[in-house]
Amino acid sequence: MALSSSSHLLPFSRPPATFPRARHAGGGRGRAGATGRFIACSSPPPPDVVVTRERGKNAKLIAALEKHNVQSLELPLIKHVEGPDTDRLSAVLRDEKFDWITITSPEAAAVFLEGWKAAGNPKVRIAVVGAGTERVFDEVIQYNDGSLEVAFSPSKAMGKFLASELPRTTETTCKVLYPASAKAGHEIQNGLSNRGFEVTRLNTYTTVSVQDVDPLILKPALSAPVVAVASPSALRAWLNLASQVDNWGNAIACIGETTASAAKKFGLKSIYYPTTPGLDGWVESILEALRAHGQSKEAPGC
């Protein structure tokens, strides 16, 4: 699917169609409920985009889309729960010293901070992936005594760039603690290990699919021309729901390349993602997907 030459988005090209062309939004107006809500100026029109992050974490995206007169349906598809190593984190921080702590997502940052505080705020140096992850540490950095320092972020907000660019701080063994989702791949730890780092990975949280999806919310969600996803886990959860209809084939707008690659592996065709992960690029990806599906948006009138 070609984009204009001025676009910075990188959609996967559309091969001969195995899915029908995306349907425009329509067919049903969902009521507000426990698992989703419309965001609109007055009575809710059919949604333009379904936003799928964990409950409480969609507000910034919804607000950014509202500026473009894009109607969002909030349908949280995943939630974060404790991982098998959650309880070990504070003890490891107390008992061992690391040259780097690598944090790759806002959720990993939030879980790490809980363990770090429980360990008595030991001195740590953090490497982060993404501006959103770094922002989780802002308040702590502002008020702590310098024991926590965010000292590195890679040139591109992706795990493979962190693995290839993280600087060594010693000529001898350089120790890295990697608190991660239990569902995260091994790209970072393998990449660092191949460069001679000694990596300790702790699976401090994981994601599970939300089970109680209101059918009255799901119906308009399945008709929306674009679904926005921020992780392979959310994508899998959406595809499980979309399997209830024949040949669902509307657009997927991914927060970054990792999720987009997962979408391609699942056989989806209409996939959009920004070159640099983050909110602004994600919004542009959603707008590009809407334009491609004949849903061009103007500034809101209310």
From Swiss-Prot:
Transmembrane segments: none annotated. It comes from the Eukaryota. Residues 1-39 are annotated as: Disordered. Pfam families: HEM4. One of its GO terms (molecular function) is uroporphyrinogen-III synthase activity. GO terms for cellular component: chloroplast. Keywords: Chlorophyll biosynthesis, Chloroplast, Lyase, Plastid, Porphyrin biosynthesis, Transit peptide. Residues 1-50 form a transit peptide. It is found in: Plastid, Chloroplast. Catalyzes cyclization of the linear tetrapyrrole, hydroxymethylbilane, to the macrocyclic uroporphyrinogen III, a precursor of tetrapyrroles such as chlorophyll, heme and phycobilins. Belongs to the uroporphyrinogen-III synthase family. This is Uroporphyrinogen-III synthase, chloroplastic. It comes from Oryza sativa subsp. japonica. The lineage of its organism: Eukaryota, Viridiplantae, Streptophyta, Embryophyta, Tracheophyta.
